Amino acid sequence: MKNFETLFAELSEKAATRPEGSRTVAELDSGVHGIGKKVVEEAAEVWMAAEYESDEAAAEEISQLLYHLQVLMLAKGLTLEDVYKHL
């Protein structure tokens, strides 16, 4: 099972190696603006799932939001430690 750290390591590897057809690479190539739009979209989907859908659906939407937030972190050059110090 993935956790926040293993997901970040996996995404960092994809950002470094840029495998062809990678969704992560495509999202990074869309830049901070494009990634930010995706974060906003996913945040709305989290809210809607939490409000109107099952716990399973809400958990899935939250996982997708976490993915896009980590891609945004990579695009900005942020590390997990950069974020953790604000928790």
Curated annotation (Swiss-Prot):
GO BP: L-histidine biosynthetic process
Coiled coil region boundaries: none
A GO cellular component annotation in the UniProt record: cytoplasm
Keyword Lipid metabolism appears in the UniProt entry: no
Gene3D superfamilies the record matches: MazG-like
Keyword set includes Nucleus: no
InterPro entries reported for this sequence: HisE, PRib-ATP_PPHydrolase-like
Subcellular location: Cytoplasm
The enzyme's E.C. designation: 3.6.1.31
Keyword terms: Amino-acid biosynthesis, ATP-binding, Cytoplasm, Histidine biosynthesis, Hydrolase, Nucleotide-binding
Pathway this chain belongs to: Amino-acid biosynthesis; L-histidine biosynthesis; L-histidine from 5-phospho-alpha-D-ribose 1-diphosphate: step 2/9
Family the UniProt entry places it in: Belongs to the PRA-PH family.
Protein's name in the database: Phosphoribosyl-ATP pyrophosphatase
Species of the source: Pseudarthrobacter chlorophenolicus (strain ATCC 700700 / DSM 12829 / CIP 107037 / JCM 12360 / KCTC 9906 / NCIMB 13794 / A6) (Arthrobacter chlorophenolicus)
